Amino acid sequence: MAISTFSIGDLGYLRNFLQNECNWFRICKKTFYREYRSVATSSPIFSLKNKPKKYCMHCEMVVLKRSHEFMFSLAVNGIHFGQFLTGIMKFKKKQVAEGLCYYVLELGSISPVDLSFIPKYNSDCVTSMHCVTPELIYENCSIVCPEEASRLTVKGLGDNKLIPLGGCGVWCLKNGGDLYIYAFVLAYDLYVACYDKTIFPSLAKIVFDMIACDSEDCVFCKDHNKHVSQAGHIVGCVSNQETCFCYTPCQKKMTDINNPELISLLCDQEINKIDIMYPEKKASLSLDINSYVHGYLGDEPCALKCVNWMPIRISSALSRLIILSCPVCKRVVMD
């Protein structure tokens, strides 16, 4: 079997994709080999040459060890892609909760190699990991205190610059190789008492559900079907799993409220318009939701209830799972 031709650029893009865009789940561990699987969203830097673009990248990797080197065979979307050699290969375990863990891959430089055979990939094997649920997110987050918030930059230059993820009141912090989601979410007691347990009640989600348009052709309000399974259960694209943060309505300024049932979570008054706000000058993270969204009754502004909301930081292990399962959030963070 001849070694496929890969340019230096091709190998660099592949290495970047495998390390930074894939969450790996271990499928098989044997004495002489291990097998891992990743279900990733489409990549802005890596694709299969001469193949139609796929919104889901199902990657299967069989790893062999020889002396002080590692060899791995890679298949993408059911097609054997190539075999590669590297001197450094580490799978760093990320434990989200009992029953939900995955691995982040660290690779040295890679080069093509010919193993003279193609291993059998366990394409039909399904991971047994637990799903990401709203309850799991609450269990894996911390409340942001004023001291921490003062060190986070929402607008302007700063060491801890938050990246807006698109929705109202949600950001990502890149800290070395770790990702952290910061968001405003409904207080836990209110979630337990009066909210749908299958949906994570972020401020971004609540505001989105209040003002999203009804057009089936709107790519902002309706086009949410290019996610992938956060725990690798399903090969192929899935709809937003209601635990993402990519809720960006097409209209943000002085928009009519279409779903008044949620108003009481934001305000005691019967507001009829929402205005999503963005800081215009250098600012650290405010813990007041009125800094990011205003309610209006006609033209009169109404104060929103901060007591119903809490600012949180989601653990890095869970944040990475959520962000990399969403094509929108992933691209925003990678840019």
UniProtKB/Swiss-Prot annotation:
The keyword Disulfide bond does not apply. Pfam families: Herpes_UL16. Keywords: Host cytoplasm, Host nucleus, Late protein, Virion, Virion tegument. One of its GO terms (cellular component) is host cell cytoplasm. The keyword Cytoplasm does not apply. InterPro entries: Herpes_UL16/UL94. Its main location: virion. It is found in: Virion tegument; Host cytoplasm; Host nucleus. Belongs to the herpesviridae cytoplasmic envelopment protein 2 family. Interacts with cytoplasmic envelopment protein 3 and with the capsid. Plays a critical role in cytoplasmic virus egress. Participates in the final step of tegumentation and envelope acquisition within the host cytoplasm by directly interacting with the capsid. Upon virion binding to target cell, a signaling cascade is triggered to disrupt the interaction with the capsid, thereby preparing capsid uncoating. This is Cytoplasmic envelopment protein 2. It comes from Human herpesvirus 6B (strain Z29). The gene is U65.
